[in-house]
Amino acid sequence: MTGGDSGLGRAAAVAYAKEGANLVIPYYNEHEDAKETKRIVEKYGAKCVILSGDLSQKEFCKAVVSKTLETFGKIDVLVNNAGVQYQQDKIEDISDEQFDWTMRVNIYGMFYLTRECVPYLKSGSSIINLTSVTTFKGDPQLIDYVTTKGAIVGFTRALARNLALKNIRVNAIAPGFFWTPLQPNCWVAKKVPTLGADAAFGRGAMPYELAPTYVFLASDDSSYMTGAVVHVNGGEVMA
C-alpha cells in the first residue's frame, strides 16, 4: 500500500490491520510518520514493513515487490494511494520540473508498481487506485494534478478489462476533500478555512470516513465490482 505513512493511507492501513491484514508500506521520506503508522498497525497484531524510496523509479518498485514476496510469500491486494499536488493559479506558473514530478509520482509510480505486482496476483486479488473528485469537476489551481487523476480513471478501467478473466478486480476511489497533512501544506493560508465547503454536507471529511471503502474494495464483498469509481465526496459531485 503506497503512501500509507499518513493521511488517507494511514487510516486505510489501520483499517486493514483491524481486519487481520499484514502490510508493506512504501513511502517517500516522511520517516517519523511511517514509523508511527507501523506502530499503530502492529498494535492491532498485524505485521508491517515500511520501505523508504522513490516510487517513480522502476528499481524501487521492483524492490518493493521483492521484499513483499520475501516477507509474506504472496500479494493479495495492491493499493496505489501515493500522490502529490501543488497549487498554482496559472498554467504559466507550472514549471517543467513540477509537471514532470507530478506525472512521475502520480502516474509512472502507479504503472511501475502495478506492472511488477500483477504477475504475482491470484484469482480473487484486488487492485485499488486513488483518483479524485477533481477529475469529475475540474480544479483551476490543480491542473497537473487533475490531469494525473483523470489518467488514473482511464488506467483503472482499461486494466480492469485486461485482468477480468483472471478474476482480478481493479477499482478506483474518488475522494472529495479530506483533512490530511497534504491539504494545509498545498493551499494558501486564506483558502484553508473554506476547504470542503463545496460538499453537500458543507464540510470536509476525516480520513477514517474513507477507510471502510478501501476495506470493502479489498474484500470478497466487492467480488462483482471491477472498473468502478467509488465516489466518497459528501455530495460534492453526484454521479
Where are the language model's segments positioned?
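Substrate-binding pocket helix/loop in short-chain dehydrogenase/reductase
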Residues: 89-91, 95-100, 195
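Active-site helix of classical SDR
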Residues: 114, 148, 156
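Alpha-helical segment proximal to the catalytic Tyr-Lys
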Residues: 119, 161-165, 223
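Residue(s) in the substrate-gating loop at a strand-loop-helix junction
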Residues: 132
